[in-house]
Design a protein with these regions (language model features):
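Conserved glycine(s) of the Walker
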Residues: 16-18
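Glycine-rich, often acidic-flanked micro-motifs
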Residues: 2-13, 27-210
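Post-Walker A alpha-helix
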Residues: 21-22
Length: 210
């Protein structure tokens, strides 16, 4: 996600709410979508830049139901059926819907690349009653958080000699730490409150006040 000359990457484990949080931040008109998949990062002119894989957000019915802007992506009958489900059933409903950003949020909300100035790692818990907390962390000292950050490039990166990474190739933690050196990392803990964390990310991380 980008906002002017600032940008943040959201990391987390599967089902952690990365896409939902990003869509909450896109409700702010000054933000722009960069990728719903991997981002490649490289240092240029003493700053870290990220380039995203061109992939639209994919959301589940719970995200769609709880965001009125997204209701255009479902039929009235679908919305009615989802509203009748218990929250736990809705959370585990295995259906995915692509979000056509231009249709839902308007033109000009997609960027191919931008600066990386913050990294947010979602480590919150759905069954927690605690308020969500966004706290700066040292990922060099919290190596377990790297598991949520490191992703295989899959077919999107090729070595100069034509080779691709093999399945099962171990990640180079030191390379990630070196690449992210100087980028403030933040861990989100506590219970899940998308709007509260979206507001804090926009007010602090994307505004440069943190």
């Amino acid at each position: 996600l980008s906002a002017g000359e600032r940008g943040l990457a959201i990391a987390g484990f599967s089902g952690g709410g990365k896409s939902t949080l990003m869509l909450h931040m896109l409700e702010r008109d000054h933000t722009a979508f960069l990728s719903n998949d991997r981002v490649f990062i490289r240092r240029a002119d003493n700053a870290l830049q990220m380039r995203g894989i061109a992939k639209l957000p994919r959301i589940n019915p719970g995200t769609l139901l709880n965001n009125p802007r997204l209701h255009v992506l479902a039929t009235p009958q679908q919305l009615q059926d989802w509203e009748a489900l218990a929250s736990d059933e809705l959370w585990h409903l295995e259906e995915k819907y692509d979000v056509p950003l231009a249709r839902v949020y308007g033109e000009g909300r997609i960027r191919l690349a931008g600066p990386l100035t913050s990294l947010v790692i979602l480590n919150w818990q759905r069954d927690s009653d605690a308020a969500p907390r966004l706290q700066r962390v040292d990922i060099g000292a919290r190596r377990e958080l790297l598991a949520a950050v490191m992703k295989s490039p899959g077919p999107f990166y090729q070595y100069a000699d034509g080779r691709f990474l093999c399945d099962g190739t171990p990640f180079d933690e030191a390379a990630y730490l070196q690449a992210l050196d100087g980028v403030p990392a933040y861990e989100v803990t506590g219970g899940i409150d998308f709007e509260a964390i979206a507001q804090q990310c926009c007010d602090e991380l994307l505004a440069g006040t943190a």
